[in-house]
């Protein structure tokens, strides 16, 4: 399971590093090989995007709707740059991290299939698509109200935070760092968790849970799940019945040969 963690963390590390370096030299940041345009030059026609990339320290608020719309407010909006293609809407700054102030970007679009944050920005969403993923490379955060997912994937490379509620037939969480995934209000039929570092994870399940922990990460599962752990270090997997007294944590230990 740890090889899967490394597979997911590598692209996030490259994304976060590239964004940081672009900001350091004052260069504009590209998303999918494109430089953004000011809002006044953005083409608002065509189908609504299904993916969001936030590559700045700004706040994005998503409202569910089939007709695409985007408005901005707050400080430094003149330096916002927006990328759009047939699937993606991307938010960045003209001068990378040196863009002045903090803006709030309000976007109307269908429940996103993918959310990507490179840096310290934040996203608040009403809902996510039935097949969806959240990817954070840095200290950004995502807060979503609900999801009813067939598959839901979370990848954090850094200290990012995610909080949300809902259900998922299959949940996959990968953390490379000190990320915090608070899905205590989300119930998964099946879950796989891989942590390389001190990340913390919480969710509910009455199904099967597999965890692989290399470090001091902690996974807390509420419900009657069948839990197994493969750990190196002080990390733990704790599975508690919802209304019963706490069960002892499954300690980190060397896997049986």
Mark where each language-model region is:
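Fold-core signature of tandem repeat domains
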Residues: 117, 123-125, 134-136, 142-144, ...
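Acidic (Asp/Glu) and glycine-rich low-complexity loops/linkers
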Residues: 2-10, 20-118, 122-135, 146-150, ...
